[in-house]
Amino acid sequence: MATRGWFSESSAQVAQIGDIMFQGHWQWVSNALQATAAAVDNINRNAYPGVSRSGSGEGAFSSSPSNGFRPKRIRSRFNR
């Protein structure tokens, strides 16, 4: 069959070209994802200080003085 020989020959070339195109596209995608992640990290660090460093306890969301006594005050009001 002539069609089968042509298909086997062209499919190998298409696979090779597609592999090269996929490698280039994946490199571009990974670069774009890394740039987006860096930009999002930079925006979060500038807009919400302490969100990326919430583990050390210096965030406005993680450590505020009202979080220390408000649950105790509500519980003591119901427990007396």
From Swiss-Prot:
Function of the molecule = Component of the photosynthetic apparatus. The light harvesting B740 complex binds bacteriochlorophyll c.
Similarity comment: family membership: Belongs to the BChl C/E-binding protein family.
**Gene3D superfamilies registered for this protein in UniProt:** bacteriochlorophyll c-binding protein
Q: What is its main location?
A: other
**Where, by residue number, does a bacteriochlorophyll c bind?**
25
What name is this protein filed under? Bacteriochlorophyll c-binding protein
Name any one GO molecular function: metal ion binding
Disordered: where is this region? 49-80
* Keywords noted in UniProt: Bacteriochlorophyll, Chlorophyll, Chlorosome, Chromophore, Electron transport, Magnesium, Metal-binding, Photosynthesis, Transport
**Annotated GO biological process:** photosynthesis
Gene Ontology CC terms, in alphabetical order = chlorosome envelope
Q: What is known of its domains?
A: The C-terminal extension may have a role in proper incorporation of the BChl c binding protein during chlorosome assembly.
Keyword Transmembrane among UniProt keywords:
no
InterPro entries reported for this sequence: Bchl_c-bd, Bchl_C-bd_sf
Propeptide stretches are 54-80
What organism does this protein naturally occur in? Chloroflexus aurantiacus (strain ATCC 29366 / DSM 635 / J-10-fl)
Composition bias (Basic residues) maps to 70-80
Its subcellular locations are: Chlorosome, Chlorosome envelope
Question: Can you tell which superkingdom this protein's organism belongs to?
Answer: Bacteria
